[in-house]
């Protein structure tokens, strides 16, 4: 991954964390690395544990940020969330996978939250 892409991703994750806090989420962990993959943000929304995938784009020629999530990435997100729950003995908690789309193509960043993006809880 190029330096510019890493910097764009890092900026997007920082903006997303602040955005989520403003929406009432409590940020538990960022950039959580597991054997199955990385979880960008682990947060709590009320009683629900949320595993948040952040997608950031500076240009929209190839689609919106959320459209860049492949079936393979979805499978990794599910496996990573399950692994996290087991590792920290949190299987009893309700959980979901959310997406935050960060559009940096305009002067002001545009963020959008998609709760329960995979439709499973």
Curated annotation (Swiss-Prot):
Tell me one Pfam family matched here: UPF0102
GO molecular function per UniProt:
nucleic acid binding
**Which SUPFAM superfamilies does this chain map to?**
Restriction endonuclease-like
Q: Which InterPro entries does the UniProt record give?
A: Restrct_endonuc-II-like, tRNA_endonuc-like_dom_sf, UPF0102_YraN-like
User: What does the sequence similarity comment in the record state about its family?
Assistant: Belongs to the UPF0102 family.
Kindly give the NCBIfam families that the UniProt entry links to this protein: PRK12497.1-3, PRK14688.1, YraN family protein
The protein's name: UPF0102 protein DET0781
Species of the source? Dehalococcoides mccartyi (strain ATCC BAA-2266 / KCTC 15142 / 195) (Dehalococcoides ethenogenes (strain 195))
Q: What is the lineage of its organism?
A: Bacteria, Bacillati, Chloroflexota, Dehalococcoidia, Dehalococcoidales
